[in-house]
Amino acid sequence: MKGKRAFMSKSLFIAEKPSVAQEFAKALKVNTSRKDGYLESENTIITWCVGHLVTMSYPEAYDPALKRWSLQTLPFLPKEFKYQVIDGVSKQFSIVSRLLNRPDIDTIYICTDSGREGEYIYRLVDQMAGVKGKTRKRVWIDSQTEEEILRGIREAKDWSEYDNLAASAYLRAKEDYLMGINFSRLLTLKYGPTISAFLKADRTVLSVGRVM
């Protein structure tokens, strides 16, 4: 029975983008068939994100009234942060989520870019997909050569080894979010009308950071 289970189990490799997934397929030298959003062979599946698949929710996800910009609702400081799948990539998220939770997948190799942002991209997907009971290993490579990819897979560590990196990624994202949401709204509400009058524009939005 154990032998049968081992034969049936598969490893899932998840890259940050399709081009990198193709490099992993070449390095692994597996005979894959092309599926919708992933490659599959007898014992290996290779899939990919397309950059970020999940993002932090805007204030109106917490309360519809917060969609309207008002000084009375600032600062916006949620006790718990909400996340959502990005609309334009929801199809790929659904594919990846289904693969992550497939019963025949026992080991997940995290092959997103080796760095804080790559770690964050996968962690958000894992969080939203609600992955449970899988072995997760982090592939950390310096290039996408065949030799380096195979070394990274061979030396892959348990993903918990990168928990501190993930924590720093979450923290930075929350800081960017709070700065952007609060200061963009504050400055726009206070100075936007004056600037609009000077520029003879209908409306002026003052953007701070990457989130508004």
Summary of predicted features, one role per range:
Residues 15, 177-211:
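Prokaryote-biased recognition of long, low-complexity C-terminal linker/tail segments
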Residues 1-187:
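Intrinsically disordered, low-complexity regulatory segments
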